[in-house]
C-alpha cells in the first residue's frame, strides 16, 4: 500500500510520541508481564497496582495475553494496559481490538512500523542499532524501546545515541535491574524502563501477591530516591 492509498490516522506521529511520553513518564517502570494462567490476571495486576505500578505491558508470549488485555481493560479501567511482543500486523490488529492502549515490539520490520503509522494506538518499536533507529525515524518515529538493553550496550549505548539522534527517547528493556535502573533513569533521553524483577515466576505460581506488591513498592521507592 502506498502512502497515498494508506488511510491517514487522526493522530500524527508527533501526537503519538507525545502520548508515549505521557504513558512512560507517568509509569517510569513498565513491568513486562507474561500470563501463564488465566486466573493470575487480576490478582497479579492488583498486586502491581497496590505497589504503585499501574502501567502494564502484557506480552503475547502466552495463549492468555490477548485475554489478559481484554480483562484488564474491562475490569481494571484505572490501569494503563499495553501489549508487548507484537511481531506482525495481524498481532497488532488483534491487540488493537482487545483494547490495548499502546503497543511494544521486540524489533522492527517495515510492516510493523507501517502498522504503527496507520494505527491510532501509539507504537514503541524495539531497536538495537543506529540503522534500525533510522528506519523508524524515516517514518516519523521518535520513541523507541532499546532491546535487549544491556547486551546492546546499555547506558553507554543510549548516551552515544544521543549524539546523532538528539530528539530520540528510549525505554531500555532487557537486563534492567535494581542495581542499574537508576543509572538508566538518570539519562535525559530515557523516559522509562521495561523490566520484570518484581515478576518472579515462583511468586506468581505460588500466588505470593504480597511479595510482588512489596517488590513493586521497593522499585518505585528506588526511583523516587533518584
From Swiss-Prot:
The keyword Lyase applies. The keyword Lyase applies. The active site is at residues 57, 145. Pyruvate binds at residues 61, 85, 145. It catalyses: 2-dehydro-3-deoxy-6-phospho-D-gluconate = D-glyceraldehyde 3-phosphate + pyruvate. Pathway: Carbohydrate acid metabolism; 2-dehydro-3-deoxy-D-gluconate degradation; D-glyceraldehyde 3-phosphate and pyruvate from 2-dehydro-3-deoxy-D-gluconate: step 2/2. The record marks 173 as: Plays a major role in determining the stereoselectivity. Its EC number is 4.1.2.14. It is an enzyme of class 4 (lyase). GO terms for molecular function: 2-dehydro-3-deoxy-phosphogluconate aldolase activity. Keywords: Carbohydrate metabolism, Lyase, Schiff base. Involved in the degradation of glucose via the Entner-Doudoroff pathway. Catalyzes the reversible, stereospecific retro-aldol cleavage of 2-keto-3-deoxy-6-phosphogluconate (KDPG) to pyruvate and D-glyceraldehyde-3-phosphate. Homotrimer. PANTHER family: 2-DEHYDRO-3-DEOXY-6-PHOSPHOGALACTONATE ALDOLASE-RELATED, 2-KETO-3-DEOXY-6-PHOSPHOGLUCONATE ALDOLASE. Belongs to the KHG/KDPG aldolase family. This is 2-dehydro-3-deoxy-phosphogluconate aldolase.
Amino acid at each position: 500500500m502506498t502512502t497515498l492509498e494508506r488511510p491517514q490516522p487522526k493522530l500524527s506521529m508527533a501526537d503519538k510520541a507525545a502520548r508515549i511520553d505521557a504513558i512512560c513518564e507517568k509509569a517510569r517502570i513498565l513491568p513486562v508481564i507474561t500470563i501463564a494462567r488465566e486466573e493470575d490476571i487480576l490478582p497479579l495486576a492488583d498486586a502491581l497496582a497496590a505497589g504503585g505500578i499501574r502501567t502494564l505491558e502484557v506480552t503475547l508470549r502466552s495463549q492468555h495475553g490477548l485475554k489478559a488485555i481484554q480483562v484488564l481493560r474491562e475490569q481494571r479501567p484505572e490501569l494503563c494496559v499495553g501489549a508487548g511482543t507484537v511481531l506482525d500486523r495481524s498481532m497488532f490488529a488483534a491487540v488493537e481490538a482487545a483494547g490495548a492502549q499502546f503497543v511494544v515490539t521486540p524489533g522492527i520490520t517495515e510492516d510493523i512500523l507501517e502498522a504503527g503509522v496507520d494505527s491510532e494506538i501509539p507504537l514503541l518499536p524495539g531497536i538495537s542499532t543506529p540503522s534500525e533507529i533510522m528506519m523508524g525515524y524515516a517514518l516519523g518515529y521518535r520513541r523507541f524501546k532499546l532491546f535487549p538493553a544491556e547486551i546492546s550496550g546499555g547506558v553507554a549505548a543510549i548516551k552515544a545515541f544521543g549524539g546523532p539522534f538528539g530528539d530520540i527517547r528510549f525505554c531500555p528493556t532487557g537486563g534492567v535491574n535494581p542495581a542499574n535502573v537508576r543509572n538508566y533513569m538518570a539519562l535525559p533521553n530515557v523516559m522509562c524502563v521495561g523490566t520484570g524483577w518484581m515478576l518472579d515466576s515462583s511468586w506468581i505460581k505460588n500466588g505470593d501477591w504480597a511479595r510482588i506488591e512489596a517488590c513493586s513498592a521497593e522499585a518505585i521507592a528506588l526511583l523516587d530516591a533518584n
